[in-house]
Amino acid sequence: MQNIEKKIKKIIAQQLGLIEQKITNESLLVEDLNADSLDIVELIMAFEEEFNIEITDEEAENLTSVQSIFDIIKKYVF
């Protein structure tokens, strides 16, 4: 599970131009990491490609924090 968490943080860091170590599970995408709506769409596409999953529109609306991303991806991977 830590491997998945690390991959998620790496993708977020790459997409948003951040330092991976500054991203915590409690980090909020918009408020803390300054992601805009386009960033979130690009993150979803990157997660879908990396983990070979399809995130529904309803799930996408609930992606507000790093932990929420992990919870949704965990549902598909495990």
UniProtKB/Swiss-Prot annotation:
<keyword id="KW-0443">Lipid metabolism</keyword>
<keyword id="KW-0963">Cytoplasm</keyword>
<dbReference type="InterPro" id="IPR036736">
    <property type="entry name" value="ACP-like_sf"/>
</dbReference>
<comment type="similarity">
    <text>Belongs to the acyl carrier protein (ACP) family.</text>
</comment>
<comment type="function">
    <text>Carrier of the growing fatty acid chain in fatty acid biosynthesis.</text>
</comment>
<keyword id="KW-0596">Phosphopantetheine</keyword>
<dbReference type="GO" id="GO:0000035">
    <property type="term" value="F:acyl binding"/>
</dbReference>
<dbReference type="InterPro" id="IPR009081">
    <property type="entry name" value="PP-bd_ACP"/>
</dbReference>
<dbReference type="GO" id="GO:0005829">
    <property type="term" value="C:cytosol"/>
</dbReference>
<dbReference type="Pfam" id="PF00550">
    <property type="entry name" value="PP-binding"/>
</dbReference>
<protein>
    <recommendedName>
        <fullName>Acyl carrier protein</fullName>
    </recommendedName>
</protein>
<dbReference type="GO" id="GO:0016020">
    <property type="term" value="C:membrane"/>
</dbReference>
<feature type="domain" description="Carrier">
    <location>
        <begin position="2"/>
        <end position="77"/>
    </location>
</feature>
<dbReference type="InterPro" id="IPR006162">
    <property type="entry name" value="Ppantetheine_attach_site"/>
</dbReference>
<dbReference type="InterPro" id="IPR003231">
    <property type="entry name" value="ACP"/>
</dbReference>
<dbReference type="GO" id="GO:0000036">
    <property type="term" value="F:acyl carrier activity"/>
</dbReference>
<comment type="pathway">
    <text>Lipid metabolism; fatty acid biosynthesis.</text>
</comment>
<dbReference type="GO" id="GO:0009245">
    <property type="term" value="P:lipid A biosynthetic process"/>
</dbReference>
<keyword id="KW-0275">Fatty acid biosynthesis</keyword>
<keyword id="KW-0444">Lipid biosynthesis</keyword>
<keyword id="KW-0597">Phosphoprotein</keyword>
<keyword id="KW-0276">Fatty acid metabolism</keyword>
<feature type="modified residue" description="O-(pantetheine 4'-phosphoryl)serine">
    <location>
        <position position="37"/>
    </location>
</feature>
